[in-house]
């Protein structure tokens, strides 16, 4: 099974992806996580350091695939999860989709692409071109990470459009949304009412999740010396169980941009309450922070 994880930049995709990968490994799956971001930090919480990228390795070998061994590009992470970082082209040049294609090509050359029960692609930011949508060419399911803010749901809607387009020629389905760092879910509920799709899980705001990223550890590793965090791991195990159930999934139909803006801004402009609290609610509903 191949899963592509998308979502707005900074929403917590990599942290979520790493914890889902460990959860899947805990369920007995052989897992490979592929980071698809020029920052090459997708697998940081699994390995504790920035591993060399596929592109760096190819360049060092003058793109001679026959000179590359699996251990040159596949690194062992926490919980037995194997890790690969695709890397990216130089800033302002090249195409991210090409890099993903080269990564898959190399893994196939190494006879590694089909050795895993689960391959999870952790993909950068919003879908803004066909190149960034390239991992969807290989995925069976897409999982969208969001929060209860306008920007994250707007990005989710763009990703939804890309899934619909790719599903015309590939056996791709949307598994559902995962809410991250979400103290309330009124905008999420409003969105999925208008654009029906499953909500796999909604994680509340948990400071230890953010701290785990800074420490370079998954929640599963942290729970070894902080047992009180076990309840957080259960969220990710629940997500893993839903993925392993091989859900039917859906081919979603995105909402037109103007309609989505009107839908979500209506709740922003007409919150319940008044006075200073009303103004504060308006800022929070759209994910804005006044500085």
Curated annotation (Swiss-Prot):
Classification via CDD domains: Bchl-like
Residues that coordinate or bind [4Fe-4S] cluster: 95, 129
GO molecular-function terms, A-Z: 4 iron, 4 sulfur cluster binding; ATP binding; metal ion binding; oxidoreductase activity, acting on iron-sulfur proteins as donors; oxidoreductase activity, acting on the CH-CH group of donors, iron-sulfur protein as acceptor
Subcellular location, principal: plastid
Gene Ontology biological-process annotations: light-independent chlorophyll biosynthetic process; photosynthesis, dark reaction
Entry keyword Iron-sulfur: yes
Presence of the UniProt keyword 4Fe-4S in the record: yes
InterPro entries membership: NifH/chlL_CS, NifH/frxC, P-loop_NTPase, Protochlorophyllide_ATP-bd
Any GO CC annotation of this UniProt entry: chloroplast
Catalysed reactions listed for this entry: chlorophyllide a + oxidized 2[4Fe-4S]-[ferredoxin] + 2 ADP + 2 phosphate = protochlorophyllide a + reduced 2[4Fe-4S]-[ferredoxin] + 2 ATP + 2 H2O
Binding sites annotated in the UniProt record for Mg(2+): 14
Localization, UniProt: Plastid, Chloroplast
Complex formation: Homodimer. Protochlorophyllide reductase is composed of three subunits; ChlL, ChlN and ChlB.
Homology family: Belongs to the NifH/BchL/ChlL family.
Protein name (database record): Light-independent protochlorophyllide reductase iron-sulfur ATP-binding protein
Lineage: Eukaryota, Viridiplantae, Streptophyta, Embryophyta, Tracheophyta
């Amino acid at each position: 099974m191949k899963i592509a994880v998308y979502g707005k930049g900074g929403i917590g995709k990599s942290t979520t992806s790493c914890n889902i990968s460990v959860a899947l490994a805990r369920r007995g799956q052989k897992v490979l996580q592929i980071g698809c971001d020029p920052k090459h930090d997708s697998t940081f919480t699994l390995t504790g350091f920035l591993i060399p990228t596929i592109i760096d390795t190819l360049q060092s070998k003058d793109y001679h695939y026959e000179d590359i061994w699996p251990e040159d590009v596949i690194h062992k992470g926490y919980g037995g999860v194997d890790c690969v970082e695709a890397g990216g082209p130089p800033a302002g040049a090249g195409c991210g989709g090409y890099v993903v294609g080269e990564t898959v090509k190399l893994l196939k050359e190494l006879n590694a692409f089909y050795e895993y029960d689960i391959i999870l692609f952790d993909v950068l930011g919003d879908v803004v071109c066909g190149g960034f949508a390239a991992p969807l060419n290989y995925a069976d399911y897409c999982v969208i990470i969001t929060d209860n803010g306008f920007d994250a749901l707007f990005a989710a809607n763009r990703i939804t459009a890309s899934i619909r387009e790719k599903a015309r020629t590939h056996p791709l389905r949307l598994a559902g949304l995962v809410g991250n760092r979400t103290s309330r879910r009124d905008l999420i509920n409003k969105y999925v009412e208008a654009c029906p799709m499953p909500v796999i899980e909604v994680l509340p705001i948990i400071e230890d999740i953010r701290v785990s990223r800074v420490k370079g550890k998954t929640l599963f590793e942290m729970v070894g010396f902080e047992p009180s965090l076990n309840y957080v791991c259960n969220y990710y195990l629940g997500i893993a169980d839903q993925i392993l159930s091989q859900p039917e999934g859906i081919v979603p139909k995105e909402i037109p941009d103007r309609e989505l803006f009107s839908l979500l801004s209506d709740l922003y402009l007409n919150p319940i309450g008044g006075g200073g609290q009303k103004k504060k609610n308006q800022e929070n509903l759209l994910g804005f922070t006044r500085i």
